[in-house]
Design a protein with these regions (language model features):
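Acidic, metal-coordinating catalytic segment for phosphate/diphosphate chemistry
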Residues: 1-11, 16-17, 28
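Short hydrophobic/aromatic beta-strand or adjacent loop that forms the aromatic wall/cage
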Residues: 7-11, 88-92, 130
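Active-site-adjacent beta-strand/loop module that shapes the phosphate/pyrophosphate-binding cleft
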Residues: 18, 78-103, 113, 117, ...
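Conserved Nudix-box catalytic region and its N-terminal flanking loop in Nudix hydrolases
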Residues: 19-60, 65, 156-161
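Short, solvent-exposed aromatic-acidic interface loops
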Residues: 25-29, 79, 110-111
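A short coil-to-beta-strand element that immediately follows conserved catalytic motifs
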Residues: 66-77
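NUDIX/MutT-family hydrolases
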Residues: 104-135, 158-161
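Charged phosphate-binding loop/patch that engages nucleotide di/tri-phosphates or the phosphate backbone
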Residues: 136-161
Length: 161
């Protein structure tokens, strides 16, 4: 029986020159010592109907980057996974970092590092993020579609919407 508890999260993967900025998150109770998106976190009250608002807040809080420093900000993936007694919904955005003043932004959540698109194999990542990144590198980076992913113990199945 499922309790009906939800955990909604949003994250962004910043892109520049065929690289993605990843964060090695440290000291977090939910996700720690794993490579994740450039910035992200849980929805706060008032953000339940707006994943973009959540993402922009987290981006500014964690990296001090505003929407003005971005181009092509787009929701590309939504995943769902039941884990630890709650339904986890992840909203994954991608954007181009266009501000030339921002090189490798420091994060309040851990260590940031740029990775070549072909250099992320084997990096430890959260379960759905690993499958999402693999799908993005194989398929998603070549189109503008929105994908939904349903996770089970064996992986994540993606479908374009």
């Amino acid at each position: 029986m499922h309790s009906g508890k939800l955990r909604s999260m949003a994250s962004v993967y910043l892109r520049r020159d065929n690289q993605l900025l990843l964060l090695y998150r440290q000291g977090n109770s939910i996700v720690s010592n794993l490579w994740i998106g450039s910035a992200g976190g849980h929805f706060e009250e008032g953000e339940v109907k707006d994943a973009r608002q959540c993402l922009l807040r987290e981006l500014y809080e964690e990296l001090a980057i505003s929407e003005a420093s971005l181009a092509n900000l787009s929701l590309r993936y939504v995943t769902m996974r039941y884990a630890d007694g709650e339904l986890r919904q992840n909203y994954y955005f991608f954007a181009d970092l266009i501000d030339p003043e921002v090189m490798t932004p420091a994060s309040t959540e851990g260590i940031t590092k740029w990775f070549a698109l072909n250099g992320m194999d084997g990096l430890p990542m959260p379960f759905t993020a690993r499958f999402m990144i693999d799908h993005y590198l194989r398929t998603g980076q070549y189109n503008d579609l929105l994908y939904a992913g349903i996770a089970n113990d064996s992986g994540v199945q993606f479908q374009s919407l």
